[in-house]
Amino acid sequence: MDRKKIAVTAGTFDLLHPGHFNTLNFAKKHADELIVIIARDETVKKIKGRRPVIPEEQRKIMIEALKPVDRAVLGSLNDKLEPIININPDIIIIGPDQTTYQINELKRQLLNHGLKPEIIKVEEYVNCQFHSSYDILKEIVRRWCNKELKV
């Protein structure tokens, strides 16, 4: 029996938007099983200078509930490659806005661990008003700053 083709993608997935769904659907079309690596809160703080709005465990639960996703795992606090090495995917999907990984450098680092996955970058952004979590945050602040929220 042939082994299932496994794809991996990674990200923060804070304040979900159509771009996230586009990347996840794209990834699932390339594999039988899609595993999503969720960036840890501390990692996001180091990279972006702020913690995510949604805590890592809640982001993991939300991503796992999405149709194209078979499983979600939290990233490593010490080594960003650790979950990829443990999963040993056939394909790695890089989102259009991801700049953490340079593809050639990622290939070289994975080859040092004996891994040779195909790496595909999603080139197309979703053309919509809120295609990034940051844009959503800016709009929330714009609408609600200095206003009392009514619940």
From Swiss-Prot:
User: What Gene3D superfamilies does its record include?
Assistant: HUPs
Question: Could you tell me the Gene Ontology terms of the biological process aspect for this record?
Answer: FAD biosynthetic process; FMN metabolic process
Q: What is its EC number?
A: 2.7.7.2
The residues that the entry says bind ATP are T12, F13, H17, P18, G19, H20, D97, Y125
Keywords recorded for this protein, A-Z = ATP-binding, FAD, Flavoprotein, FMN, Nucleotide-binding, Nucleotidyltransferase, Transferase
The pathway noted for it is: Cofactor biosynthesis; FAD biosynthesis; FAD from FMN: step 1/1
What are its cofactors? a divalent metal cation
One Pfam family name is CTP_transf_like
Q: What class of enzyme is it?
A: transferase
GO molecular function terms attached to this record? ATP binding; FMN adenylyltransferase activity
The record's section on SUPFAM superfamilies has:
Nucleotidylyl transferase
Substrates-to-products reaction catalysed: FMN + ATP + H(+) = FAD + diphosphate
Q: Which NCBIfam families match?
A: cyt_tran_rel
The text of the family note is: Belongs to the archaeal FAD synthase family.
Q: Which HAMAP family match?
A: FAD_synth_arch
* Function field: Catalyzes the transfer of the AMP portion of ATP to flavin mononucleotide (FMN) to produce flavin adenine dinucleotide (FAD) coenzyme.
Assembly description: Homodimer.
- Name this protein carries in UniProt: FAD synthase
Q: Which organism is it from?
A: Methanococcus vannielii (strain ATCC 35089 / DSM 1224 / JCM 13029 / OCM 148 / SB)
**High-level lineage:** Archaea, Methanobacteriati, Methanobacteriota, Methanomada group, Methanococci
